Amino acid sequence: LNKLIGYNLPLGNYWLKKLQQDYNGTVIILESKENIVKIVFGGFVYALLSSDESGLQKRNHEWCEKFGGKKMLEETFFKILSSKFINFISEQTFGFYDNMELRHFVAWTEDDTVEIIAHYEPEIEIQKKK
C-alpha cells in the first residue's frame, strides 16, 4: 500500500503559479514553458500544507530513498496511499477520519511543495501554452 503513484503530467520544469483555497475547493495551478496544469479538489480537503521545497529536505530524502530518486524527480504531481502525513492527521483527529480512504497528494516543483490530504481524486486539466 505504501507506494507512489504518478499522474504522468507532460515532462518539464514546473513552477507553482497559483494556490487557492476557498468555499469552492482547492486549486493548484502549475506552469512550465510548454504547459499549464490545473488541479482542482472540488470538495473538502482534510489538510493542506504549502512549503518551500528546500524546507522539507529530510522528508524529501526519505521519499527519494523509499520510492527511487529518479522516479521522484520525474513526477510533478503524485499521490501516496500511506504516509506519515496521513498518520499525523489520523492522530490529531483521534482517528475521526480512519473509516475514509485518505490519500496524500503532492505537487512538487523545483521551488515549492503543495500537499493535500483528501479522500477523492482531483480533476486535472492540462493545456498547451500558445
Question: What are these model-derived regions, one by one?
Answer:
Residues 1-130:
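Surface-exposed, interaction-prone regions used to assemble/regulate multi-protein complexes
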